[in-house]
Structure formats: structure tokens, C-alpha cells
Amino acid sequence: ANNPGQLALPWPVPVSGGQGLNVMNHACAAFYAALNVNRLTVSCELNQKELRELFASGGNYVMEAYGRTQLMLLNHCPRRTEKGDEQQDSRCNECARLGGCPEIYTDRKGYRFPLRRLQMEHGCVLRLYNSVETDMAKYAEKLHHLSVSLRLAFTDESPERQREIVASYRGVLDSGRALHSISPSATAGQLLRGVQ
């Protein structure tokens, strides 16, 4: 689940809390556990000390170690909004007419944010991802000692790069050593410093 509203639905399978339900502290974890969420995603804004405190209280946690963080869901298509058409409905054919959904949204400062289209019954929803990927491999030894499950999220990596990243993070879990090259533009998150 990525939205608290999803927790009100009856689920025939165990529910894991995704990035949208990220956990900052024990009180938040206890709240979701009371709603039968069996696995929780820790906030990417927690530092090493805060993570240790959270993990000490028990629970089943996963940490996003690699990938582009989803920043938002867009209910209004940037292409249609730019043209002044703010309606969003299933009759829209802009993507089909113009060769598909734009894959990149470039902001006024030149940052490039990948978009992924979800076609829904009522129209489209676009996932907007961070302009840089998170790659915590440079903290491999620290991640290993945290003894937490790691989530790897792929958006635009080639199958070869995906295999390389998966194998590398297996090394992080097993021995505290990452084997892949880290993109110079990647962010390593807040593990050492926290939010300033």
C-alpha cells in the first residue's frame, strides 16, 4: 500500500507499506502495525542513528537503497495542461496522436524528471520520478550492519545494468561490499547526515 486509504480495503494477501507510507519513528510503525501492515518502508530522510533507534523497537522494515524516488502522481497531463486543456478523461488521445506519453519532464532549471504513464479507466495518471537516482552503494558496509531488507527500484536501466545492480546489492547484504560503479550524479540519501 502506498496510500493510507488503501488500508481500509480488505486484502486477501499480507500488506506491505510502500514509499507513500514511509515510517519516521516507532509511533508511526506501531500505528501501521495496528492496521496489519506487515512490512514497512523506512523514510529516506532518516540518518543512521535514527534508523538504529527505529530498528531497535522491532518490526519488519525495508529501505530504498537504489532507484529513482517517485516524487508525485500527476492527475493532469503536462502536455494537455500546457495547451490549456485541464480536463482529464478516458477520451484523451493526445499520447496516441503524438507518439506516446512524454518520457521526460524538464523543469525551468533544466532538471530532467522521468515520467511513467498509468492508463486508468478515467484517464491517465503520471508517475514523476526524481531527476537523480538514489544509490547507497558507497555506504555498503553501513547498510550491511543495519541488517535491513533493501529495495531496488528500476525505471530506465537496461536489463544488463539491472542484473549488475542486483548482484552488487546481494554483495552488500552478504558481505558489506558493493561491486557496481556509482553514477556521479546519484545521491546517497541522508544516511550519514539526516535532513538539514
Region locations from a protein language model:
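Active-site pocket-lining/capping segments in soluble small-molecule metabolic enzymes
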Residues: 1-31, 35-196
